[in-house]
């Protein structure tokens, strides 16, 4: 199945927007059900982290970067976010599913490996959950810093096996040393899909929380 191209424990994952969009398009109709069966709670965890670290969480404009079928949008609204919520994703079928949840103010197709269709300082918060695996990290970090206003907060997940092997920790630390942002929280590796037969023990998630200077 197409999802097997993206749920890989060996880390051999494509960063092609077109390839991954095709896989998620094929999976969109079953995505929510299967993720629930696998005990997926990352959206709720991430929304809670943003709420705990973003002072004006309730009213701030927020970007769901790689919104997929809208699970993170639902979690944000359930956590009390009432501000303008933008969802961007490269899977058109996932966007259609997300639209049915009626939690976003703006939903738009976007290749997240290209500049984000937002102005400088447009949002106060960003969530990027389960998406960094498919992106060029250095480029998306710079884009987050561009679209975040000063004092804005980004919460993201990274596969624990990529944290060092892809140099993610080093990139984050370099940007912090440059004074671009401040690390507020970096979690230990956490269960990501605890009910998945392959992911449960082999792949965990690190949650990062950073505030723009």
Identify what each model region corresponds to.
Residues 124-138:
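A short SAM/SAH-binding and catalytic strip from SAM-dependent methyltransferases
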Residues 1-30:
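N-terminal, positively charged/glycine-rich alpha-helical extensions of SAM-dependent methyltransferases
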Residues 151-160:
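Conserved beta-strand signature within the Rossmann-like core of class I S-adenosyl-L-methionine
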Residues 116-126:
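A short acidic, Gly/Pro-enriched loop at the edge of an enzyme's catalytic core
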Residues 180-213:
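Class I S-adenosyl-L-methionine
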Residues 32-48:
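Conserved SAM-binding loop and adjacent beta-strand
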Residues 63-115:
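Class I SAM-dependent methyltransferase SAM/SAH-binding core
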């Amino acid at each position: 199945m197409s999802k097997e191209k993206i749920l890989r424990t060996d880390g051999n994952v494509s960063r092609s927007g077109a390839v991954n969009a095709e896989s998620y398009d094929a999976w969109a109709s079953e995505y929510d059900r299967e993720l629930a069966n696998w005990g997926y709670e990352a959206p709720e965890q991430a929304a809670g982290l943003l709420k705990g670290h973003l002072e004006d969480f309730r009213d701030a404009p927020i970007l769901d970067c790689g919104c997929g079928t809208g699970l993170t949008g639902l979690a944000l609204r359930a956590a009390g976010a009432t501000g303008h919520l933008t969802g961007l994703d490269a899977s058109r079928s996932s966007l259609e599913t997300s639209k049915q949840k009626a939690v976003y103010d703006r939903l738009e197709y976007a290749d997240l490996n290209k500049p984000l269709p937002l102005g400088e300082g447009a949002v106060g918060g960003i969530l990027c959950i389960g998406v960094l695996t498919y992106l060029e990290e250095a480029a998306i970090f710079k884009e987050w810093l561009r679209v975040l206003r000063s004092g804005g907060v980004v919460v993201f997940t990274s596969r624990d096996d990529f944290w060092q092997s892809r140099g993610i920790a080093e990139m984050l630390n370099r940007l912090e040393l440059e004074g671009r942002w401040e690390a507020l929280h970096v979690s230990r590796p956490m269960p990501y899909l605890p009910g998945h037969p392959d992911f449960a023990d082999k792949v965990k998630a690190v949650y990062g929380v950073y505030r723009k200077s």
